[in-house]
Amino acid sequence: MQPKSLSFVFLDHTADIKIQIKGATLNEIFENTVQAVAHYINSGDPIASKKGKIIEVQGIDTPSLLYNFIDELLYLIDAEHFIPSKASVFLRGNNLKAEIFGDDAKNYHLTQIKAATFAEMDISKKKSGWEAIVVLDV
């Protein structure tokens, strides 16, 4: 079960994890993606924001930028054993710089996400802000 105040919702999908992410701005889509990933991998339990890491990601367009951003989050989790909890994102065109806050993975029992996918990925501006759909391979 997830609180109503979250800016993302998990949608039904046959084999993977499908997430609808909302934000007032495109920056918020990326920031809320971090929260959605954190929520899933730690079963909705909070993750401390004890450390910060700076990441930079590029894409050829907005969907590829989001894909590469998620891929970088998964790299932090798998290779650096760093669990993201929130982010502060700066966008300039198809370039992203973010400070990712989180904690050491050893402090948590995590559910694995294998990879980001381009399947069903969509990012669009709506009347009420921005919305993205992402599917993660688990």
Model-derived regions, located:
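N-terminal intrinsically disordered, cationic/polar leader segments
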Residues: 2-138
